[in-house]
Amino acid sequence: LFQEEIFMPMIEAKVTVNLPEEKRNVLKAELGKAITIIGKPESYLMINLIDKQDLYFAGKKLEKGAYVEVKVLGKADHSKTNEMTAHLCDVFESILGIPQDAVYISYWGTDCWGWNGSNF
C-alpha cells in the first residue's frame, strides 16, 4: 500500500488559450515540479490539461485565463499551498501568457481515493 502522504495528487487545468503539444509538454513538466512544493511526488501525479475553454469572471469572458484544481489524498499544508499558488501563477504567465490576476486555483483534499478496485 501507498502512504496517504504521497499518493495520487491530481492537477486539472482549464485554460482559455490553445495548448500546442510543445507547450503541453513544458506545462506538464512544470506542474510536476510544482506538486513537490506541497510534498507530493511527480511519480504519482495525474494531470489533465483542457484548452480552449470559455471562462468567465464577474460576468465577463476572460480572453486569457486559467482555472486550476489541485486535488490530493489527505490535506495540503496551507503555507505550502500559498507557495504553490505563487509558483503556478508564474508558470501559467511565463508559459501561456496568462496574467497572474487571471489564474484561479482551488485546492481539494479527500480522505478517500479509489484506484485499482479499492480505496485508499
Task: Put a short name on every predicted segment.
Residues 1-7:
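Short, Lys/Arg-enriched N-terminal segments with co-localized hydrophobic residues
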Residues 8-120:
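Interaction-mediating elements
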